[in-house]
Amino acid sequence: MYGLLKGKKGIIFGALNDQSIAWKVAERCHEEGAEFILSNAPIAMRMGEIDALAQKTNSEVIGADATSMEDLGKLFDAAIAKFGKIDFILHSIGMSVNVRKGKHYTDINYDWLEKGWDVSAVSFHKVMKTAWEKDCMNEWGSILALTYIAAQRTFPDYNDMGDNKSYLESIARSFGYYW
């Protein structure tokens, strides 16, 4: 490859299996010379194949629930201990119980909506807040979140995830102002 990310260090959230966008991003980052920590929620780590990706990319796996400030604090402390300041963060996290359970948008379960909102969008704010408070980003570093066109248009089967992605994009704009 080209070594575009040689010497760059970061955290990649959300790789579950080889069908995950975060998985493919991690592979490319590794091919381009980056070093990173892989992270996902403990339950997702049990269901997924993240250890295989870690072995393939010579990366460390640190479980963290991205909705937990305590977990994020520990993850970022470990990243700082390993790398010093970091150059990139990828937030590739999303989940809707309403979609999984086949609930129609006009009949969504609000407790599930709240959970999906926290996982899919608010966690991005929590990740950036933790990075901000720990002053762990190198100058000109990048923080990325994956979104979907349903944040801008209606896709009925995407259900409340469209709402979640809209809020994710709003968080990116609002917190991005301060970086």
Which residues does each predicted region cover?
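Local beta-strand N-terminus motif with an aromatic residue
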Residues: 58, 85-86, 113
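Conserved hydrophobic beta-strands of the Rossmann-like cofactor-binding core
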Residues: 9-13, 89-94
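Conserved glycine-rich Rossmann-like NAD(P)H-binding loop of the short-chain dehydrogenase/reductase
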Residues: 32-50
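Canonical Rossmann dinucleotide-binding motif of NAD(H)/NADP(H)-dependent dehydrogenases/reductases
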Residues: 2-38
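Rossmann-fold cofactor-recognition segment
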Residues: 54-70
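Catalytic loop of short-chain dehydrogenase/reductase
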Residues: 14-21, 94-179
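Active-site loop/turn elements of alpha/beta-hydrolase fold enzymes
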Residues: 41, 66, 148
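Conserved Rossmann-fold cofactor-binding substructure of NAD(P)-dependent oxidoreductases
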Residues: 67-82
